[in-house]
UniProtKB/Swiss-Prot annotation:
Keyword set, alphabetical order: Cleavage on pair of basic residues, HDL, Lipid transport, Secreted, Signal, Transport
GO cellular component, as recorded: spherical high-density lipoprotein particle
Tissue: Plasma.
Protein name per Swiss-Prot or TrEMBL: Apolipoprotein A-II
GO BP annotations listed: cholesterol homeostasis; cholesterol transport; lipoprotein metabolic process; positive regulation of phagocytosis; protein stabilization
Protein's organism: Panthera tigris altaica (Siberian tiger)
Signal peptide: 1-18
Gene: APOA2
Quaternary structure, from the entry: Monomer. Interacts with NAXE and NDRG1.
Keyword Transmembrane helix among UniProt keywords: no
Length: 100
């Protein structure tokens, strides 16, 4: 009877140890996965910074901003003029009833 109890106890301990080892292995694989993810993101960021330092990309960005400024400047000036005219019309409408 004691031998049977010792055998059951030994098998239980071995199975629990095996489960503990598997659980630790799963945690390590999760840590490894997260570590690889952060390493990939870091490498991608470094590559992006190196590409942004290139003169070709800077020249493209400068040309884009200049083109945008050329297209938007007349629109902004026209919008400003229209706004001033609109406000002047309100001022004239308020001034007319007061003089009558």
């Amino acid at each position: 009877m004691k031998l049977l109890a010792m055998t059951v106890l030994l098998l239980t301990i071995c199975s629990l140890e095996g489960a503990l080892v598997r659980r630790q292995a799963e945690e390590l694989s999760l840590q490894r996965l997260v570590s690889q993810y952060f390493q990939t993101v870091t490498d991608y960021g470094k590559d992006l910074v190196e590409k942004a330092k290139g003169p070709e990309l800077q020249a493209q960005a400068k040309a884009y901003f200049e083109k945008t400024q050329e297209q938007l400047t007349p629109l902004v000036k026209k919008a400003g003029t229209d706004l001033i005219n609109f406000l002047n019309n309100f001022m004239d409408l308020k001034a007319q009833p007061a003089t009558q």
